[in-house]
């Protein structure tokens, strides 16, 4: 069981909106840069909160995505600003804490959209994002999740995750065939009303299986 820490960790960092590079990156993708932070020296910053990196020799700039639970900072994700094969680095201050973005901003008694990435979740109302594998979200007070995976009908990992979600009886979004964009952020940038598309394409049970079998390309 996870209990919120007694000693609060703080993000003594500028907002991503205050740095031209991180603000430019996020604004170009229509993401609200005031919701995130910016670390000029990511490894050094993380080590100041939790000894994580043995060496800070090749440090780098990253956008900081904070993970909160009951107003406590329980972890963070660093998103690379420059080209980097490791786009995201997740650091948890307690390994039992939920690797979920947005938990403090939702109503658990209403339907909750569950996206693959924190940035995608910011475009939807009452949404969270998984910052790791699909977690058991029931224990975090979410009774009616609607799972939203990337629009990648040839990605075996995504296909197996959708299949597991359907088999569990949960609701899942199956993207219509006319949409080519890979994720919610790309869809928003192309001018789609994503919230409406999601409402019209949420399924469960046998209907979800039928739609899934039509959508997948493997």
Please give the residue ranges for each predicted region.
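Generic secondary-structure boundary/loop-capping signal
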Residues: 4, 8-10, 28, 73, ...
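Generic short alpha-helical hydrophobic face used as a protein-protein interaction/packing hotspot
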Residues: 30-31, 75, 128, 188
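Phosphate-handling DNA/RNA-contact segment within nucleic-acid enzymes
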Residues: 48-144, 158-159
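TOPRIM metal-binding catalytic domain and adjacent DNA-binding surface shared by DnaG-type primases
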Residues: 1-64, 68-70, 106-107, 199-218
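TOPRIM fold recognition
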Residues: 86, 108-112, 118-218
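Alpha-helix initiation and N-capping motif
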Residues: 19, 23, 73, 181, ...
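A sequence-composition feature that detects small, non-aromatic residues
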Residues: 4, 16, 28, 39, ...
